Amino acid sequence: MPVEQYLALDDTTDGLYEYWHGLVLMLRPPSSVSLEEAFVDMAGGSPTHAALSARLASLIDQGLPQDSLCVVYSSDVRLKLAEDHYLHPDVTVSCTEQAEGVLTHPTVIIEVLSPNTEKRDRSAKLTAYKALPSLQEYLLIGSEEKEIIVYRRENDWRPYHYNEGDSVELASLGVSFPFDAVYRRIRLA
């Protein structure tokens, strides 16, 4: 599918789609399609996935200084990696002004792992995101087990694993939050 068709599809339906070098991946079917009709494996979609995404966005937003220029975005906002590559990360934080309707300069990207996306989030997306000059930190959040991994540009993208009782540090934002707060009252899948 040409990129123009993808952009029209993503802009004109209430479904959510990613565009990976010519391939369209459905993340959320449009409301006009029943789940039985949506025969492709969709990303996320579980209550656990949604709760973790919302919790992380809230913890980061609450931790930002009042005078911060950073804005926290949900997966509803499209991220442009290249002319033929658009994704919808679960949570994106950008600290620079963005064009209307599309993010291009993320500072932090968060993906909540699910069985359908984990391999892609840990490999292909990690590689693609690392190529973004503005990106400073990439987080992977477990939805089946308590797991938080942070990759940092300043650390040559080596993974840092956080555990229960730790304080998760997002140095690029000057934000920290308790590991345990991420999973509080959330039942894992």
At which residue positions do the language-model features occur?
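Gly/Pro/Ser/Thr-rich low-complexity, intrinsically disordered segments predominantly at protein N-termini
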Residues: 1-189
